[in-house]
Amino acid sequence: GCDALLSGDHGGLISANGC
């Protein structure tokens, strides 16, 4: 999602809700 470095979500799949 937005915090790729923190959540390990480089594609924006995990923390998309955080956007």
Curated annotation (Swiss-Prot):
Tissue expression remark: Expressed by the venom gland.
GO-annotated cellular components: extracellular region
Main subcellular localisation: secreted
Keyword Secreted: yes
Keywords for the protein's UniProt record, in alphabetical order: Secreted
Cell compartments where the protein resides: Secreted
Protein name, UniProt field: Cryptide TyPep-2
Organism of derivation: Tityus serrulatus
